[in-house]
């Protein structure tokens, strides 16, 4: 038997490329889809809900990402629309054979809108490489709730992350334009010795599960004390006024994903009001 190594190399170099786009407008008393775009591994499904907010579930059909893979989500809300966006499952970032996996999210919200970006956790495996970016453009009067949770190895499965590269970049701007006023920025980087870096108290205090939650809303202040009660000693919450934007910033850490989710779930349910948690979130 003769094996064509060139063909094997071609197959091994195939990469995941996914792009999903969703535009939502408010018409006839409720939020409705005005545009839906799916390409490659990115799929979007809408479960039945009894009214606003519209709920959308993002799916990566590849089952995970590794070096060289690309996944992008674009969500835009028209005036007075509301939506909750989540993922079907945790995103998995596998060992890289070269290059980085990239996840890019772009959110736009017009005035009078409320957008909740609530993906399930991202799980990093040993020797994985991930670059994650989040770009948000808000018109004045728009509200947004954002969470990004990251798990460094599943301890219950005997997995550890000693070496990996992870970067997480956020930019949130007012004015509904890419050059609008910057009201929030994150620039978080770990690696290559992630296992050792996570031990440091200012980083994660030996935690293997972390989450960042951001609420920008005129009513953010009323949730401060309740959020602190839920978060407890393993994390914190702070309130700022940046121009016309009131933002509540929260961080949580835990020894494992289950312990993190036991606090993260109630926190998101509190902050997301009547919409609560997406249906696909389980405990």
Swiss-Prot record:
The keyword Cytoplasm applies. It comes from the Bacteria. GO terms for cellular component: cytoplasm. It is found in: Cytoplasm. InterPro entries: UreD. Disulfide bonds: none annotated. GO terms for molecular function: nickel cation binding. Keywords: Chaperone, Cytoplasm, Nickel insertion. Its main location: cytoplasm. Required for maturation of urease via the functional incorporation of the urease nickel metallocenter. HAMAP family: UreD. Belongs to the UreD family. UreD, UreF and UreG form a complex that acts as a GTP-hydrolysis-dependent molecular chaperone, activating the urease apoprotein by helping to assemble the nickel containing metallocenter of UreC. The UreE protein probably delivers the nickel. This is Urease accessory protein UreD 1. The gene is ureD1.
């Amino acid at each position: 038997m003769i094996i064509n190594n060139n063909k094997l190399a071609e197959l091994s170099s195939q990469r995941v490329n996914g792009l999903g786009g969703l535009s939502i407008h408010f018409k006839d008393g409720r939020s409705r889809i005005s545009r839906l775009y799916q390409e490659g591994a990115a799929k979007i499904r809408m479960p039945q809900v009894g009214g606003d907010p519209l709920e959308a579930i993002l799916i990566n059909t590849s089952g995970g990402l590794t070096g060289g893979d690309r996944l992008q989500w674009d969500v835009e809300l028209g005036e007075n629309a509301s939506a909750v966006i989540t993922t079907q499952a945790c995103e998995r970032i596998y060992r890289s054979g070269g290059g980085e996996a990239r996840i890019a999210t772009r959110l736009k919200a017009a005035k009078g809108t409320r957008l909740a970006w609530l993906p399930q956790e991202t799980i990093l495996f040993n020797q994985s490489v991930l670059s994650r970016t989040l770009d948000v453009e808000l018109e004045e009067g728009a509200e947004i709730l954002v969470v990004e949770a990251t798990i460094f190895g599943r301890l219950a499965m005997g997995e550890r992350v000693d070496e990996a590269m992870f970067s997480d970049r956020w930019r949130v701007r007012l004015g509904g334009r890419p050059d609008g006023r910057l009201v929030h920025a994150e620039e978080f980087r770990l690696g290559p010795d992630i296992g050792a870096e996570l031990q440091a108290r200012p980083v994660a205090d030996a935690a293997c599960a972390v989450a960042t939650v951001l609420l920008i809303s005129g009513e953010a202040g009323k949730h401060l004390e309740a959020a602190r009660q839920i978060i407890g000693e393993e994390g914190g919450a702070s309130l700022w006024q940046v121009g016309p934007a009131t933002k509540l910033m929260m961080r949580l850490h835990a020894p494992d994903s289950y312990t993190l989710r036991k606090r993260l779930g109630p926190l998101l349910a509190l902050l997301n009001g009547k919409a609560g948690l997406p249906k696909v979130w389980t405990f």
